[in-house]
Amino acid sequence: AYFDWTNIGGLPVYASAGRRPSTGGAPLNFREDEPRGGTPLGSRINYQFDGITLGWHIREESTLRFCYGIGYESEWGNGSELKRPADRLDDASFYGLNWDVWDTDDMFIQATVARAKDVTDGFNGLVVIPVDPLTGQDAPAPAVLRFDPSVQVGDIDLASAVLIRHDGPFDWFISGNYMESDPTNETGVFGGLFTDPFDKPQSQDGHMYYAGIRYNVPNEKTKIGLEFNHGSKYWFNFALAEDDFLGAKTSVRGDVWEAYVTHRIRDRFVAKLDYINYQFDYSGSGWLLGAPKKLDNNPTLGFPTYDEASKWMLSISARF
C-alpha cells in the first residue's frame, strides 16, 4: 500500500510514502514487453522495500526524485527482539537520487546514484547450508537452519545510467553501472563485505554494462530481442526480486547472452520464448559476502557454483 500527494502548494512537486515502485525498472521491461515498472534502473535495483519519495517535475520531459527506504528492519517481528538492545543491529537503509533526464516517446535517459547504508550479513529467515562455508566439506548440522543477521558489514554506493531509443521498427538501449563498497571491520560466518571470514575487509569496486536491441514485427504484436551484459569481479546489485531460478542475470560476474521472442496475444496477455546463456567468471554472483574466486582455478567454495549454464523457457504472462 502507498499514498501520493501531488501538486503540493500548487507547485510541480509531490510526495509518496509506502511500498516503493522499485521492481521492473528500465531497461528490464524490454525483455517482458511491458511498460517500465519501477522508478530506479532495474540493472541496479530490482528489490522491494518501503519508504518515501519526494519528486520535482522540472519540466514535462524531466523529473528529479529523492528516495529513502528501509531494506532491513531490525526491530519488530524478527529474532533481534530476543537480543539485548545493545546487541541489536541498526536498520539497513537506502538513499538515492533518481533523475529522468529526458523522457519522451522516442528517447529515455535516466541517471541514478544511491547508497545502501548499514548493510547486514544476511536476512531473517531460513537458509540452506549443505556445506561448511569455511572448509567446503559437508555441513555437520542440519542443512536447513534459521538465520538472523549478526553484523553490519558496511555501506554500498551505486551509480548507473541508461539511454533508450525508439528508431523506426527498432528499440535499443545501453546502460552503464558502477558499485563501490565501504566496509566495516566486521565479518560474520559467511565473511565480510566482499571478504572471506577472518580476512580484513577492504574497499572494492565493480561495474556492469548492459545493452540490448529489439525488432518490432509489422503485425504490432511480435517482438524479437537480443541482449548482452557483462559484470566484473566485484560487481553487485540489489536484484532479489528477480524470479529466475538461476538468479538475476544482471548480477552475474561474467557474460550473459539472451535471445527472446514475445507475442502479445491480448493487451495484457503475453507469450514468450526465451534462451539465456550464462558464463560465470567468478563465484558469488548476486552475493555481497565473501571474496569472489576465479572459477577456472577450481577454487574451494562454500556453496555449489555454476561456471556455465543455459536455459530455454516458454512462458505466458497475464497482467491485472
Predicted segments — roles?
Residues 1-76, 96, 100-108, 206-240:
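Outer membrane beta-barrel
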Residues 39-45, 83-87, 150-151, 201, ...:
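Alpha-helix capping and helix-loop boundary segments enriched in small/acidic/polar residues
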Residues 44-45, 73, 80-100, 114-121:
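Loop-rich catalytic cores of soluble enzymes, especially ATP-dependent carboxylate-amine ligases
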Residues 46-51, 93-94, 98-100, 247-262:
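Outer-membrane beta-barrel signature, preferentially recognizing the C-terminal barrel domain
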Residues 47, 111, 191-195:
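Generic preference for hydrophobic/aromatic residues in regular secondary structure cores
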Residues 68, 111-113, 124-126:
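Extended catalytic-interface subdomain
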Residues 105-110, 116-119, 274, 278:
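C-terminal intrinsically disordered extensions
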Residues 122-320:
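Outer-membrane beta-barrel pore domains
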